Design a protein with these regions (language model features):
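Extracytoplasmic gate region of multi-pass secondary transporters
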Residues: 19-24, 142, 150, 220-262, ...
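Central cavity-lining transmembrane alpha-helices of secondary-active solute carriers
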Residues: 39-57, 263-275
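C-terminal ends and interior cores of transmembrane alpha-helices
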Residues: 73-93
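Hydrophobic core of transmembrane alpha-helices in multi-pass small-molecule transporters
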Residues: 78, 94-113, 230
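Cytoplasmic helix-loop-helix junction between adjacent transmembrane helices
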Residues: 102-141
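Glycine-rich segments within core transmembrane alpha-helices of 12-TM secondary carriers
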Residues: 132-158
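Symmetry-related core transmembrane helices of the 12-TM Major Facilitator Superfamily/SLC fold
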Residues: 170-190
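Flexible cytoplasmic inter-helical loops of multi-pass small-molecule transporters
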Residues: 189-211
Length: 279
């Protein structure tokens, strides 16, 4: 079950961050600028910022199995819609406008109730004493499946035409992304235990109360950690531009640059995450 949850977490975030591996295909197929590609992620970030808190509140009242299935199904539909946008070869402004809407809506799939539902599902699988082990297995499965999915996406890009037929290759790469979120939806429907809403209800002391917001905002540690995360994520986001550097300056192919991106983003994380936990 934890491996399936890892597949869900590893697959749903591939699409909104696809430019980390497929930077040049995204730019060239949509006929957009570097700034416009950045705005896609900005739309996604805005949606996530707005939705995380209400999503967490709603997750307290929602069965995690239903929430995960709905989130993954919506992600599959939106990823498929983007693939169709590529296939239709729409005018640049139209295709880009549709893409902005898709990136905003994908926040509903991955940033609304999904993340909290994943945490809730992991929590109910094991006992209180097993939580550390449960999360460790989940994150290992998450990183491993994300690396495998990204590699399959890159294979689909090459099989579909690669740099010689970038539109076709990019289309099949996006289709493969949708296939994995669909697979995760089916596996969760089959294997994740669907406990009753009564069994999954959150204890009163653990539920969200608006008065807690004031308490949290008064805590200096919260602001300090927020600044740290902001800085770290800023560096992480900027690392996406290492991919076009490899293709434009170093003159690597999209495939070779994609392999470097997968190594940087997923494989290194598999080593760095547990090492960081030890340190």
């Amino acid at each position: 079950t934890l491996i399936i949850l890892g597949l869900a977490g590893g697959s749903i975030y591939i699409f909104p961050y696809l430019k980390y591996v497929f930077y040049d295909p995204l730019i060239q197929v949509l006929h957009i600028s570097d700034t416009q590609s950045g705005l896609l992620l900005t739309m996604y970030a805005i949606g996530c910022v707005i939705l995380y808190i209400p999503g967490g509140i709603l997750a307290d009242k929602t069965n995690p199995k239903k929430a995960l299935m709905l989130s993954l199904a919506v992600a599959t539909i939106l990823t498929g819609a983007f693939a169709v946008t590529i296939l239709l070869d729409l005018p640049g402004s139209v295709a880009y406008g549709i893409s902005l809407v898709i990136w905003l809506l994908i926040a509903f799939a991955s940033g609304f109730v999904f993340w909290t539902a994943i945490l809730k599902a992991i929590r109910i699988i094991g006992t209180e004493e097993e939580q550390g082990t449960m999360y460790g297995i989940y994150y290992a499965a998450n990183g491993t499946t994300a690396a495998i999915i990204a590699a399959v996406n890159l294979w689909a890009y090459n099989a579909g035409g690669g740099d010689s037929n970038m539109k076709s290759g990019f289309f099949w790469a996006v289709v493969s992304m949708a296939a994995f979120t669909l697979l995760a939806t089916i596996l969760i429907a089959i294997f994740l235990e669907g406990k009753s809403d009564k069994d999954l209800s959150t204890a009163e002391e653990d539920k969200f109360h608006f008065g807690d917001v004031v308490t949290v905002l008064k805590n200096p540690a919260v602001w300090m950690i927020s600044v740290v995360f902001f800085c770290v994520y800023g560096v992480y986001s900027c690392s996406s531009y290492f991919t076009p550097y490899l293709t434009d300056i170093v003159k690597l192919s999209t495939t070779a640059a994609g392999v470097c991106a997968i190594l940087r983003q997923y494989i290194v994380m598999l080593v760095a995450a547990p090492l960081g936990g030890i340190l």
